Amino acid sequence: MKINNLSEHNCIINRYLAEMRDCDYQKNRLLFRNNIKRIGEYEAFEISKTLNYENRDVTTPLGVAQVNFPTDEIVIGTIFRAGLPFHEGFLNIFDHSGNAFVSAYREYTNKEHTEIG
């Protein structure tokens, strides 16, 4: 498996991460979610470079063009709530992919909600 650490390279994603880590920026939930979505889009684009592709002919108004289409079947899975903006970013790139969702909750065993059981 190849690991691509995006923070090791100069790219716009570093700004999005810095904004998300900023204490004041985190208070604006809309901007925070939008940056999670943007990061999902960027990461999906980077992943798309590693997929398998095949050449296909596409008829255009000007003739026939050869285009490389991905052949991998993709399913995007996420854990509900926190992962949804990230998931949406991936769907913006992999719009023909399947979807999977996982839902979970914490069951507390005491009134103070400090013990999980």
Region annotations inferred by a language model:
Residues M1-G117:
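PRPP-associated nucleotide enzymes
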